[in-house]
Amino acid sequence: MTDPIKVFGNVGSPYTQKMLSLLRYRNIPYSVSWGDVVQNLSFLNIEPPKPVLLPTMVFKDDEGLDICRTDTTPIIRYLEELYEEKSVIPSSPILSFLNYLLEDFADEWTTKYMFHYRWYFNEDADNAKKMLVLQHKIDIDDESMNQFGDIIADRQINRLWVVGSNDDTAKLIDQSYKRYLSLMENHLKFLPFMFCLLYTSPSPRDLAR
């Protein structure tokens, strides 16, 4: 592939940041469009995926037609087939399995930390909603920003149960997060990557952390 990969994402999306980190590290050409994915795809007459997830990345199929992909884990493996340089998948089957396991942990569990700390506490939610509004439009008056922000915040706060964040689990999530930070801090004092004893470049697990 020679054409830049089209990435449609959100600044606040950890999965968008995960894939941008991968593309930058592997020197894979890409262009990124921020904001409303469906709207941005419509500008290019590209049919959005179902469901629309972040990021949405556009590739060419065998007939040269645009096709959207959204799940970061298989996208990373697909990119391994397209580009040979600076592979991020450990060649050892054992390390590859551990990488897959830890990447899944990062994607499915550590995102609970993000959603919890972003939307559970009122002060954090107030800050998050303003940042997300300004991502879509920076020339906006305070009243409109607050109205738009309240819509975003209500939607996200009402969905906290989806990631398991509530009054009963708040303490567990906080304890898990602090334990995770402690383990990562100890590991990174001696090694720059998760698997660098035998593998000297970042893995998808590193990109997802």
Give, region by region, the residue ranges found by the protein language model.
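Extended alpha-helical scaffolds
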Residues: F115, W119-L198
